[in-house]
Every structure is written in structure tokens, then in C-alpha cells.
């Protein structure tokens, strides 16, 4: 059913925030009834000069599954944001959630450990109110964790047509894992009007020198190395996979990028010292293995010092050229196909390798299952058919 939320239902006002629903009791599951999808509509909740959070998850061992959040508003003209789900607790699972057609970030994780964001979709979100309606603060998913907030994972999620980025790990003090996640058409409206930054996976960074050096050292060191594996980036306005001025390398394993402005952009800042911490330089200390890309609009790979990175079996160093004939389908409409019955990502032909592709068995073993004599390149392993 559809539930129209009202301002009198706001559970708590705290500083600049209005928290509509506050989940602070441990060990409770909030699950949609089988074959039903509760939809919570927040379009009528507009407290003046407040950042709106639909669900604040402060407790531990909470499981939320199978609901939709739509219409979350922004009411502040200056720099601000609203959020569908804000996570502060630990050992929580957010599963099969849809956050769409609003102005808010889908999932915004600030603290807590061992949280799993599983098979969630964030799409068609644009803040049309603040900062001239550029939409520069509305990501699909974000993790901006405090020290000690470890082992947090995004798995099987999709982010598309979010006005800023698909996934954003800026100002993050602990390593995060993103696996089997998709990001497409971020930085655009649903009719492809340009909005915010538009990176698919924005992995790291500390505001490129706008934070004081002492703040970075005190609150974020040792700088984390995040992991992005078996992920897909398609048609994002800027980078498909982007290191965002990070002060360390990341792990980029078995990803696929297609038709982004730049498919892989490894831009770092030069070094963590008072002089260089805000100065851009080619990426260093990244580990890129078994990655695949095709048809970047401007460049396949940029901003990388290959001599200071670990590079193994990536398409940009092969003695062969990736072509459309390597793929069963380039039909982008399959990206928004319905999820499978268990909530997992749709199993389509899109960007799956053909039986004759030279990209099959072109990878190197990184500890995950593969079908034949070696892993394939990219996020989809050839299954004997496609």
C-alpha cells in the first residue's frame, strides 16, 4: 500500500535534522509482508530549514526489507542534503529497498560496523531546491564513516539517474567494500539534462585540500584502501570508476566500464604531507586487476602512474582491442530490468561475453570462483553460453 507521511509523524528534531522514523531498538526486523510492497511517500513533509531523514537507524541488528521510500524533500536553499536512510548502528541489513523520485540520498552511512546494504535501488533522485538546483549533493549511496566503523559492504545495489554520484566514499575513515553493484546515468536527470558531478563510483578523497591537514591526519589516517569488485559503470556523466583525489590507492578488481566520459580515472593527490595533500597527481598505489572497459566517450584510462600501481590483466594493457563483437548485447535498457525473485540483480545478456571473445580466460586468479582455466575480464564470468 501507499502511505502518505505527515509532518506530525516526525519522531525527533535534532540540530539541523528532522528524523521522521527513528529505529533505536536492537534486534528488530521490519519486513514487507510477502507479495506486498509498502511505499512511504514523504512529499508532504517539508519542515522549514531542516534536513529531512526518512529513517534513522541508530540501533544494532536491525533488518529492513522490501519497502520503498519516495518523495523525500529538501527545504534549505543553501548547502544541505536529505536522506532516505541514515545508518549509525552496527550489524544491520538493509535489503531490497527502493529509494526513488525524491530529492534525497538513498543510503547514507556515517558510523557502525558490519552493516550490509543488499540488493537496493536508488534512482531518479534530484535536489531541485538547494544551491541553484544543481543537485550536487544527491548521491545514490554514500559511506562517510568514522574511525572504527569497519566491515561495511554494499552488495548487489543499483544507482541510476541520481543527480550527483552513484556511490560516494568521500571523507571516509575506514575501508568499504562495493561488490556486484551497478551505476549508470548518474549526473543526469531522467531525460539526460546535466546535473551534478556524475561519477558512477567515487571512491575516496578528502575534499582536495579544503579540509585542514591536521583534520585529515587526526580523523582519517591511516587512509583506507577501499575495494570495488565485480561492479558495472555505464553512461555516467564523468568517471565510471573514479579515485576522487584520494590519498591512497584502492583495489579495483574485475569491473566493467562502458560509455562513461572516462571509464577509469585514478586521480589522486600527491602525498599525505602538509604541502602535497591538496595537490592533484596521477594515481599511485592502486591495484587494478582483470578490469574491462569499452567505448569511453573521451578516454578509457587517465590520471595514473602505472609505475607506482599494481596492474594485472587489464584490458588497457592487452595486445588485443575490445570491440562490440565481444559482447552478446549492448542493449542498455536491460540495466533497469526487474530484479530476480530473490531480489538479486537481473540476469540479462547486457555486456556478457560471447563464446568467441578473447576476453574469456584473459584474467588472473584473485581468489574468486571462475569457470574455465582462468577468470574472464570484467564483472560477468562467461557461463558456457554467454
Where are these regions (language model features)?
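Parallel beta-helix/beta-solenoid
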Residues: 20, 25, 35, 58-60, ...
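Extracellular beta-strand/beta-solenoid scaffold signature
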Residues: 9-20, 44-56, 77-86, 101-109, ...
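Predominantly extracellular beta-rich ligand-binding scaffolds that present long acidic/polar faces
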Residues: 180, 224-349
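Right-handed parallel beta-helix/beta-spiral solenoid domain characteristic of secreted/periplasmic
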Residues: 4-9, 22-78
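C-terminal/domain-terminus segments
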Residues: 11-18, 174-179, 247-254, 260, ...
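Feature marks extracellular polysaccharide-active and adherence modules
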Residues: 31-33, 57-58, 65, 70, ...
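N-terminal, post-signal-peptide segments of secreted/periplasmic proteins
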Residues: 3-24, 346-353
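C-terminal accessory segments
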Residues: 319-386
Amino acid at each position: 500500500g501507499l502511505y502518505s507521511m505527515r509532518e506530525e509523524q516526525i519522531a525527533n528534531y535534532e540540530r539541523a535534522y528532522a528524523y521522521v522514523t527513528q529505529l533505536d531498538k536492537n534486534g528488530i526486523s521490519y519486513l514487507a509482508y510477502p507479495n506486498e510492497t509498502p511505499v512511504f511517500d514523504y512529499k508532504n513533509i517539508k519542515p522549514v530549514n531542516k534536513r529531512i531523514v526518512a529513517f534513522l537507524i541508530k540501533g544494532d541488528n536491525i533488518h529492513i526489507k522490501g519497502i520503498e521510500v519516495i518523495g523525500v524533500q529538501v527545504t534549505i536553499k543553501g548547502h544541505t542534503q536529505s536522506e532516505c536512510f541514515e545508518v549509525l548502528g552496527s550489524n544491520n541489513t538493509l535489503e531490497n529497498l527502493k529509494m526513488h523520485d525524491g530529492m534525497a540520498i538513498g543510503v547514507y552511512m556515517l558510523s557502525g560496523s558490519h552493516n550490509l546494504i543488499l540488493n537496493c535501488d536508488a534512482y531518479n533522485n534530484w535536489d531541485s531546491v538547494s544551491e541553484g538546483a544543481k543537485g550536487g549533493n544527491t548521491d545514490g549511496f554514500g559511506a562517510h564513516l568514522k574511525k572504527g566503523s569497519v566491515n561495511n559492504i554494499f552488495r548487489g545495489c543499483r544507482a541510476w539517474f541520481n543527480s550527483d554520484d552513484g556511490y560516494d566514499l568521500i571523507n571516509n575513515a575506514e575501508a568499504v567494500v562495493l561488490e556486484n553493484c551497478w551505476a549508470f546515468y548518474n549526473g543526469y536527470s531522467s531525460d539526460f539534462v546535466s546535473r551534478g558531478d556524475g561519477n558512477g563510483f567515487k571512491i575516496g578523497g578528502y575534499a582536495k585540500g579544503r579540509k585542514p591537514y591536521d583534520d585529515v591526519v587526526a580523523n582519517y589516517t591511516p587512509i583506507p584502501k577501499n575495494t570495488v569488485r565485480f561492479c558495472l559503470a555505464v553512461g555516467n556523466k564523468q568517471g565510471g570508476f573514479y579515485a576522487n583525489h584520494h590519498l591512497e590507492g584502492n583495489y579495483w578488481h574485475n569491473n566493467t566500464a562502458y560509455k562513461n566520459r572516462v571509464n577509469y580515472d585514478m586521480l589522486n593527490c600527491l602525498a599525505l604531507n602538509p604541502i602535497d595533500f591538496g595537490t592533484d597527481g596521477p594515481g599511485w598505489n592502486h591495484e587494478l586487476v582483470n578490469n574491462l572497459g569499452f567505448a569511453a566517450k573521451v578516454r578509457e584510462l587517465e590520471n595514473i602512474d602505472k609505475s607506482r600501481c599494481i596492474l594485472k590483466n587489464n584490458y588497457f594493457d592487452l595486445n588485443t582491442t575490445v570491440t562490440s563483437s565481444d559482447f552478446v548485447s549492448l542493449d542498455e535498457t536491460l540495466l533497469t530490468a526487474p530484479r530476480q525473485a530473490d531480489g538479486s540483480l537481473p540476469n540479462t545478456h547486457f555486456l556478457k561475453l560471447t563464446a568467441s571473445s578473447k576476453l574469456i580466460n584473459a584474467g588472473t586468479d584473485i581468489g574468486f570462483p571462475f569457470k574455465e582455466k582462468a577468470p574472464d575480464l570484467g564483472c560477468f564470468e562467461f557461463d558456457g553460453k554467454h
